Amino acid sequence: WWDGVVAAVRQAMNGLSDVVNIRAIGLSGQMHSLVALDSHDEVIRPAILWNDTRTSEQCREIERRLGSDGLRHLVGNPALEGFTAPKLLWMRDHEPKNYSRIATMLLPKDYVRLKLTGVKAMDPSDAAGTLMFDIAETRWSSAAVAKMEIPETWLPEIVPSNKVSGTLSGEAAAALGLSAGIPVAGGAADNAAAAIGSAVTSPGTAMVSIGTGATVVAPIPNAAVDPGLRLHTFNHAEPDGWYLMGVVLAAGSALAWWRDQTGGGQSFDELVVGAAETAPGADDLTFLPYLTGNRTPHANASARGAFVGLHAGHTRAHMTRAVIEGVTFSLHDSYQLILAQTEAPTELIGTSGGMRSAFWQQMVADVFGVPLTPVKSSGSPYGAAILAACAAGKFDRPSEVAPQWVTRGKTADPIPAHAD
């Protein structure tokens, strides 16, 4: 990751005539993934990523230790395989020597922060996805980590997303070709940053992001937790904000899998052309996109994908459309639960790879029954930049500037006939 940061920053600097005007650095990264460090801040083992589902046994242990009330009231989320705490317990059970060496637990963007500044810190939006954070009080949950017997000393300082977490060290500045002392913002988890970068900062707005996985995010006014723990409640990068989130683990990756299994060689745009020419419903063919399990709303890591209703008349185009529809309807399952807990948005904001497709934009609008407007910028990086501007003192809250800075594309209105 650090090598990638160095290469990317130096490449970006090649296109700038005056690097001294860089006022701050923003951070964003994938949620949940465990970076375990020893007492010398050296990485102990390769990171265990967010979509790794090896921790089912540890999740059941956490459920026993915390109970459903503890999960709701201490950490505000279900014990799911992708979260960070189960990964620590997996290391305890399967890599005891590595586990005994842990001195600090970080997430991906926070490891990059450490390399940039020498500071070990995490923002609330990422901490919320560890299963060790009190989302209502915006602090580590001493009670939860005690019940899981995870040392609280491993947990880094919490810093606000929109404030300075540290400054660029001389060593990092030399590696990047920048000036030492540049402020580094607290930053945000990828979905929280994408919401900031899409101007989805307050209740009544919602965002659909489709990349490797897919998410639907809806800001809420308080730390309300789904009674059935079928959704996530996370801290927003907007100060004193929270959001509900539903997740499809295999979204763009399901389409990539389908392309690769049928010969590959086509770009996603080429693959989608045939699907777009096929009528909605894919001739009664249904695809279940559970290639890596289901996260919300069913929380079943053992769930598996399937084509249902396949007959000899179905073509590759039908099956491609079924894959895209399956991802969209799976995400809609979570959206229906969100609507039961917060006000319905008047429009959806689309971001990330899948939402660059006009075909997929229209499908989301049709299935959700809400107009969808894509943003032209890349949500997470743009959100990180807005948070950097706040850390530099240009603004106080992301919501002050995001609506003015975010450029929107053409709105896709629902076509009722497509949903029938």
Each language-model region and where it sits:
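Active-site nucleophile and cofactor-binding loops and adjacent substrate-binding regions
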Residues: 24-29, 48-51, 75-83, 103-108, ...
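Glycine/Thr-rich phosphate-binding loops that ligate phosphate moieties of nucleotide
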Residues: 3-7, 23-65, 97, 118-121, ...
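A polyampholytic, Gly/Pro-enriched intrinsically disordered region
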Residues: 64-80, 177-179, 204-207, 390-404
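Gly/Ser/Thr-rich active-site cleft segment
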Residues: 71-189, 255, 288-292, 320, ...
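Short helix-loop-beta connector
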Residues: 18-22, 99-101, 178-180, 201-203, ...
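N-terminal phosphate-binding loop and adjacent alpha-helix
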Residues: 1-19
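Residue-level preference for well-ordered alpha-helical positions
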Residues: 13, 63, 72, 92, ...
